[in-house]
């Protein structure tokens, strides 16, 4: 099944003037534009690609690696702000990530970076960002064990330390008196 916001391994099904058409195991096709193909690509080859919706709402593939995938939190810079929301640089050429007004907590300013979570909109299937993290980051069902090595994202700073997102799922705290190197929001 082809779904936006994820890296998938697909098979080249055919070549067109616009690029390669890649198919999943159910023969659903998506276009990989010419800018991302090589002269050696041929039908039957496997390609690892990231899927997203373009400005015309078509599902498109890219070989670029985004800064975030569905289900991940990150620290992204606002490149533009409109009446409907903000647009974030998520590392894809010519495609910014939408942060709708309804998903913004506090004021968003162009040029600044914010902690966001990337999810798939249940109605449109598009990748959407939110700064309202409570729905996605919680400690209801802890999935990590004591002393387990984990990935952290520093989300905010307080008097006692830094609030962190653990494994894109949980809240944690790094206390100032236990830090062995300087850290900042977004690390």
Outline where the language-model segments fall:
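Single-stranded RNA-binding regions, centering on S1/OB-family and related RNA-binding modules
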Residues: 1-187
């Amino acid at each position: 099944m082809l779904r936006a916001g994820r890296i998938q391994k697909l098979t080249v099904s055919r070549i067109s003037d616009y690029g390669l058409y890649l198919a999943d195991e159910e023969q659903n096709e998506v276009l990989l534009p010419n800018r991302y193909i090589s002269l050696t690509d041929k039908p039957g080859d496997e390609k690892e690609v990231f899927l997203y919706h373009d400005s015309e709402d078509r599902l498109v593939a890219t070989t670029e690696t985004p800064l975030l995938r569905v289900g991940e939190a990150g620290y992204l810079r606002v490149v533009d702000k409109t009446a409907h929301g903000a647009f974030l640089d998520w590392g894809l050429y010519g495609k910014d990530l939408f942060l709708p007004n309804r998903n913004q907590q506090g004021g968003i300013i162009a040029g600044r970076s914010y902690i966001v979570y990337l999810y798939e909109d249940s109605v449109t299937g598009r990748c959407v960002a939110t700064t309202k993290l409570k729905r996605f980051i919680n400690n209801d069902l802890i999935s990590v064990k004591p002393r387990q090595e984990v990935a952290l994202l520093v989300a905010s700073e307080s008097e006692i330390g830094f609030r962190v997102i653990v494994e894109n799922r949980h809240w944690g705290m790094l206390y100032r008196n236990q830090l062995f190197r300087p850290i900042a929001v977004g690390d």
